[in-house]
């Protein structure tokens, strides 16, 4: 019975407030990768949205979930660490550098 309780505790989805904090971490990480809120890459809304979408898809693929609020509690710490280290793809990084360098030229 204790095994069942432990299993349920670890497999239970995270609290909605924790899911919200993960979304905030994602936003902060993506904005930082884009070069900040004043960067041309962030100002290009269509491009910025695609980077946010890429980040979301990467996260959901990594944890094999369809929605943030379905993340099992046992992965809560790993999810936080994920957003601290997430990086866009190489092609996306090159586009960010191109957009941000263009404004400095």
Write out the residue ranges for each language-model feature.
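A general nucleic-acid interaction/assembly signal
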Residues: 1-105
